[in-house]
Amino acid sequence: MVDFPTTARVVIIGGGVVGTSALYHLCKFGWKDSILLEKNELTAGSTWHAAGNCPSFSTSWAIMNMQRYSLELYRGLAEEVDYPMNYHVTGSLRLAHSRNRMKEFERCRSMGKYQGMDLDIMQVSDMKDIYPFLETHDLAGGLYDPDDGDIDPAQLTQALAKGARNMGGKIFRFTPAIGISREGDEWVVHTEKGNIRCEKVVNAAGYYAQRVGEWFKPFGGRTVPMVTMSHQ
């Protein structure tokens, strides 16, 4: 049994795909004295019912770059950490019903080409070669993304967690953070098992992120602009 730590360089609050990705990448870049706290089981929050779509399409350079990196990571992660993971590269065809939409696709394609992605503008006459049942009478064209696909979010989370553990990161499940305080230049994360002093705190609490964010407002933090709603 691992003793509960009292210090760390970074404490991550939240054990979904964002939290485990943060821990994995911190460890990969040498910040191995990092800890993840999860109030329940890994993926028990918003991650377990995520759709798992893996597009590279975006009109934002930064988001496209992040998605490109993610797709590259997913291709080799299962083998790297020795954890089975359902990741399917299926390709996708996005449809344009106007010339303005085609201009948006052309801009996206240009950004993608610069970042090394093989996005392709499709003429209407060529689109049925990809999807023969497509109705094309009202289309202006399309954008084909051969790298689009889907992934199992729970398996991805567990793979990232395993990779982080392999590099020395620590994960504590069923250990909710219950508050934070500040002592000098350090943060103190409070849990029922004890307090952890650290340099940095990462709020990866998913649909609890707004609630966790409120803890930081007395120290200059801002409200996380989100609301949690129940649905079927």
Whereabouts are the PLM-identified features?
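Beta1/beta-strand and adjacent pyrophosphate-binding region of the FAD-binding site
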Residues: 4-18, 35
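Central helical "cap/lid" subdomain
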Residues: 195-232
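Dinucleotide-binding Rossmann-like beta1-alpha1 core, especially the glycine-rich loop
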Residues: 52-130
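Core beta-strand elements of the Rossmann-like FAD/NAD(P) dinucleotide-binding domain
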Residues: 5-8, 190-200
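A conserved short coil-to-beta-strand element within the FAD-binding core of flavoproteins
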Residues: 125, 173-187
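Glycine-rich FAD pyrophosphate-binding loop
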Residues: 27-48
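Conserved Rossmann-like nucleotide-cofactor binding loop
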Residues: 18, 42, 208
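Helix-loop-beta segment of a Rossmann-like dinucleotide-binding subdomain
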Residues: 4-7, 85-94, 108, 115, ...
